[in-house]
Each structure stands twice: as C-alpha cells, then as structure tokens.
C-alpha cells in the first residue's frame, strides 16, 4: 500500500513543526526520513500513524483518506527505539499481544507468531522473557510484533539508536531483508545518514519541518540540490570555501577554477574528502591531525582559518604539523550560490 502526504501542516500552538510537506511513497518501498534533531522527521512519522493530528493537509493510504484517524484505526505496524516490550510476558506472548487484541483464533495466532518469529530469526527464543535477550534480539521481537497482524505499512522511529555499532549494522541489514521479504511499505526515521544510505530505496532529507530533497541514496550523494544536502550527506562532511568570481574564474592560492559562472558573483566551492589530490602546488595547508582508518588515512588540514578533511591511501606518509598542497579533482567540484546556497554546477 502506497502513502501520500498532501500539503501536510502540523502545529503545536504557534509553532509550525511540519510546513506544507508533500510526499509520495510507492507501495513496497523502504524510505528513510533523515535529518538533524528538530527537522520534523519523527513528527512526520507520528502524524502519519495518527499520534499527532495535522493542522491541515491530507494523509492517504492507497486510495483511502486516513487524515485524523486514530492509530488503532489504521492497521499499521509501529516500532519505536525503546522496544516497548512487556517484561512479564514471554517473547511468544509479546509477539501475539496485538493478535489477542484483534481476537484472532488461538490456532491461527500461534501459527502466525511462529511464522513472523522465523522471518526475524528468533523462533528459538519464543519461551524466553525480554530480560534474557540482547538489545538486537529485543528489537527483532518488536519488529515481529509489529508485523504479526500483517500490516501493509511499517513505521520505524529511530529503531537502532539504542544498539551498539556492530548490532546497528547487523540489525539494519535484517530490517532491509525483512522488508524485502514481506513487501511491506516501510518508513524508517533516523538522524544517521549512514543508516539511511545503506537501507533505503529513497531518502527524504528534512530540515526545519520541510523537505530539502527526495532521491535515491546514490543520487543524493552525487547530485545534492543545495549546500545543506551536500554537507549532511557523506562522511566526512563536504569541504566548503567561499570564492570571489571574476570573468568566470575563481582562485584559491595557486589553484584556479575556470568557467564557474558568467555572472560576477560570489559562490561557495564544495569538494569531498575523497575527491582531492596531493599536489606540488595548489591550495596550501598545514596537517593538523592524521587518523588511520584501515585502508585509508583521514587528514585534517588548516588553511586560513578553514578546516579541510582529506582522505588518502594508508601508504601515504606525512607528519602532523607539516605543510601540504592539495587540489580538488577536476569534475568533482560543486559550485553553490553564496546567497541562496542552491546548487549551480559541477566543475
């Protein structure tokens, strides 16, 4: 079942938390609502599931207008970051709780509990209590419970935030597998761009209650529509430099960029850490720190009160405190308007 949001506005008193959000989520896809704290991603999710009520606009599931309905009227599955498992119940009872409320036949309920437990790979844990499970296993129980009643839509609010790094990676892979196997339409809320990039069919990047960009992870990384998107997507963050342009040319130290814009205007140059060459001349900087990341090293450079991040091969040797020249690779520079911060071109 697909989801449509049409000009959705959510207010808390005089504060507008969601401002004219329009979005279409295709049936059977997993999309991530991504953004910094306060961007409106969780508020959007809670409005879709009926916890918050919209000030205006519409929410449509399939061809059904569900605007303003209560959560229990929507037939959706919900997974929260705190798992919300009942500690006195077994895993079997936790998974079956929504089926009991829906008055499922006991035999059919037992069959469904085992079915979803196998789907999330916890069928050997059904007679344990939540306290006997790891964080990752508890999260799988929460997902199984959400899927038990066969929802067409699954909503997950920061479901991995309480897990350690290794478990986060494993569990997000499991969520993706489960979503593909079941074909459920899923919305995954996260502030972690790595999670969103790895799990999503599409990313919806939000800021200040509005959508900045909707696209596939690869397209958002390669083709950001503004400086905010470029800075939020990618690790480390994109490097930025303000440039004065004259006759289409911008200069930083001995590094010259041509054909920037025909207009006489100031722009912002952006380039990613992996798109930099070490050179004999170019942008001069001092090496502040060298971090070993395995196959690569991350250099933190200082240049005229600016900080640049540069990735180099592990075999490249340079000492902290030394000088270095760098050049952004041709065709890998992003030009943004200084005033609007909108994307202009690559060069």
Spell out what each predicted region is.
Residues 57-65:
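Conserved ABC transporter NBD signature motif
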Residues 34-36:
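The feature captures the beta-strand-to-loop junction immediately N-terminal to the Walker
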Residues 42-45, 141:
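ABC ATPase nucleotide-binding domain helices that frame the ATP-binding cleft
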Residues 4, 24, 60, 325-327:
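ABC ATPase nucleotide-binding domain
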Residues 49:
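Helix-to-loop junction immediately C-terminal to a conserved catalytic motif
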Residues 236, 249-347:
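Non-catalytic connector elements of ABC transporters
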Residues 30, 71-81, 85-228:
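ABC ATPase nucleotide-binding domains
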């Amino acid at each position: 079942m697909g989801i449509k949001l049409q000009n959705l506005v959510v207010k808390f008193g005089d504060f507008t938390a969601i401002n004219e959000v329009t979005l279409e989520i295709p049936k059977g896809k997993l999309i991530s609502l991504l953004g910094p704290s306060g961007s409106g991603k969780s508020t959007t999710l809670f409005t879709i599931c009926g916890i918050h009520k919209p000030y205006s606009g519409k929410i449509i599931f399939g061809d059904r207008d569900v605007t303003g309905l209560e959560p229990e009227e929507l037939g959706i599955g919900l997974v929260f970051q705190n798992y919300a498992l009942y500690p006195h119940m077994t895993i079997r009872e936790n998974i079956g709780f929504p089926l009991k409320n829906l008055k499922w036949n006991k035999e059919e309920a037992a069959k469904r509990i085992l079915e979803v437990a196998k789907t999330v790979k916890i069928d050997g844990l059904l007679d344990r209590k939540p306290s006997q499970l790891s964080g990752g296993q508890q999260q799988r129980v929460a997902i199984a419970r959400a899927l038990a009643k066969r929802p067409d839509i699954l909503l997950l609010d920061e479901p991995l935030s309480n897990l350690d790094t290794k478990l986060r990676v494993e569990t997000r892979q499991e969520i993706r597998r489960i979503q593909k196997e079941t074909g459920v339409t899923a919305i995954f809320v996260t502030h972690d761009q790595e999670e969103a990039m790895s799990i999503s069919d599409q990313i919806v990047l939000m800021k200040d209650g509005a959508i900045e960009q909707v696209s596939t992870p690869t397209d958002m990384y390669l083709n950001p529509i503004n400086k905010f998107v470029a800075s939020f997507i990618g690790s480390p963050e994109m490097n930025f430099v303000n440039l004065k342009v004259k006759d289409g040319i911008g200069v930083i130290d001995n590094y010259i960029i041509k054909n920037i814009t025909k207009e006489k205007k100031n722009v912002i140059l952006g380039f990613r850490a992996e798109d930099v060459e070490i050179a004999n001349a170019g942008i001069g900087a001092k090496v502040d720190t060298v971090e070993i990341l395995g196959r690569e090293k991350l250099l933190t450079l200082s240049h005229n009160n600016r900080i640049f991040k540069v990735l180099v091969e592990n075999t490249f040797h340079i000492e902290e405190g030394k000088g270095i020249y760098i050049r952004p690779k041709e065709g890998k520079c992003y030009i943004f308007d200084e005033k609007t911060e909108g994307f202009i071109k690559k060069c």
